[in-house]
């Protein structure tokens, strides 16, 4: 199933239609849909697709390339010789980091190939990579031999929540939020899910060959040689420990420096560091959050229960009992995306320029949307609950109180509540949204 990606596909097709040499880099976490995107762009074009492995790539590549260009059989086993036979062709090399692992000099070889053999041709060279750390350091960095040779870079991100409806047109929005808490916007996981969601999850966990048991190890091996400490940190964050001190206490690492580990997790986009929206990104009030719902789900529910799952005694009810609490955080992400869409359509009281969390001395506001130029602020409370009128009034009063603590005294203030279901949306004090508004 191919969902969304219109902008990426348009950009790729423009490159493929050009009369110039094009060198395009596509990267993003595993399972995100890089290969599908690349192959979709060339489905009606003659091309060479090669998935790099951990050894003997020269031999394997030659075999695949010969199906499109038989004369390559006469080339010696050498990348430079190969590309001499492949001028003006479309060549896709998937998992390019495997070529780098096999031979680090391949970067300089490809630099030479581009500079000497390809730059004045119509060749289209597309390389894909799932190791974000290696693609960043070895391919995209200004220190890379390939720096300055690329004509296009596409970073593939998870699909947005709204696109889940295309995977599950019969699902209600509440069930889509439940699925999103498990699969995020990762196409590979979304394609695995069947409705009803809880029946699927129960069966999947009980499968002896379930992908849930090995998937995160599979993801982490691409980024870390020794993942043990990284796993512990991710588990700590998944259970609500967001400050450096909280993470250290959870792990019992009071005297250890976790900063390098956190920095590495940020680099590969497993986690992100957030600061209150009114503060600098360098603020000491930083908190750490898992970026990917699938990874958060794994470390909250699968990783701590692997033994019980292996023994076949884990009960899905343990997840169900906690899931609404977990979805509180997930729904904040959904609400943020929803408000950004409304903002694009000019359906809010003003056009905001940034949006994020705020916290200070034990007080928190789920989202604040700001336009500092016009001095306008929208304060938002997000509740994964069914809200009656009295609940709305109580939440609004508390949100109004907290808004006075933020320090935006000269700003024009607006208020909003986003809930699972709101009894009545007639409230003159604030904007009210629930899942019905997502349609």
From Swiss-Prot:
One of its GO terms (molecular function) is ATP binding. It comes from the Archaea. Keywords: ATP-binding, Nucleotide-binding, Plasmid. Gene3D superfamilies: P-loop containing nucleotide triphosphate hydrolases, Winged helix-like DNA-binding domain superfamily/Winged helix DNA-binding domain. ATP binds at residues 28-35. InterPro entries: ATPase_dom, DUF234, P-loop_NTPase, Restrct_endonuc-II-like, WH-like_DNA-bd_sf, WH_DNA-bd_sf. This is Uncharacterized protein MJECL04. It comes from Methanocaldococcus jannaschii (strain ATCC 43067 / DSM 2661 / JAL-1 / JCM 10045 / NBRC 100440) (Methanococcus jannaschii). The lineage of its organism: Archaea, Methanobacteriati, Methanobacteriota, Methanomada group, Methanococci.
